């Protein structure tokens, strides 16, 4: 996605150069942690979780929590429930036996994230229509959950301890609407050095 900037008269007679590309390969390994918050049990008919590389599943084999469908703060997101449990969806003449895929998006479903890679773009609508899901395994089997606000915040480039205001939905909207802080920092540093 291109970014456009207008610098008014600050750059008259000067040439702005964007920072050099960073060559490190970002991934989600140090960001996404085990948590059963909002997790839903995934059965083999929902998705064959054994097809996901073992290193991509966040595990705590001592944990014996199960999904909590009664506590509104711990219930799986309704969009996750639909994408994980509804079968045989037809879209533009193509039948999808399930609506989940690992490491890539399908037009009608959600993506089980590959923590070895960077995240797809986080947008403000993730609060009401999440499409990126974390694969989990504990004593009771396999689960999926949405990315949590603290994880989304770090994916977007905010420090782990950065404070947001409002409830969980407002946090996600703020994160999704934000320009990544590392990008702004590099641009400002280049502006200052002009």
Give the location of each predicted region.
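C-terminal target-recognition/interaction regions appended to catalytic cores
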Residues: 21-194
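Rossmann-like dinucleotide-binding core of oxidoreductases
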Residues: 1-13
């Amino acid at each position: 996605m291109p970014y456009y900037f207008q610098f008014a008269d600050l750059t008259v007679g000067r040439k702005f150069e964007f920072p050099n590309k960073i060559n490190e390969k970002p991934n989600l390994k140090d960001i996404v942690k085990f948590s059963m918050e909002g997790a839903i049990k995934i059965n083999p008919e929902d998705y064959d979780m054994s097809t996901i590389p073992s290193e991509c599943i966040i595990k705590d084999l001592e944990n014996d929590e199960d999904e909590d469908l009664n506590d509104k703060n711990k219930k799986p997101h309704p969009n996750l429930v639909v994408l994980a449990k509804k079968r045989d969806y037809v879209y533009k003449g193509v039948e999808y036996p399930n609506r989940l895929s690992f490491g890539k998006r399908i037009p009608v479903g959600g993506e089980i994230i590959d923590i070895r890679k960077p995240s797809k773009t986080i947008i403000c609508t993730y609060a009401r229509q999440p499409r990126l899901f974390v694969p989990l395994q504990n004593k009771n089997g396999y689960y999926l959950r949405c990315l949590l606000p603290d994880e989304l915040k770090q994916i977007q480039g905010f420090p782990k301890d950065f404070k947001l205001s409002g409830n969980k939905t407002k946090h996600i909207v703020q994160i999704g609407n934000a320009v990544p802080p590392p990008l702004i920092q590099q641009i400002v540093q280049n502006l200052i050095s002009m």
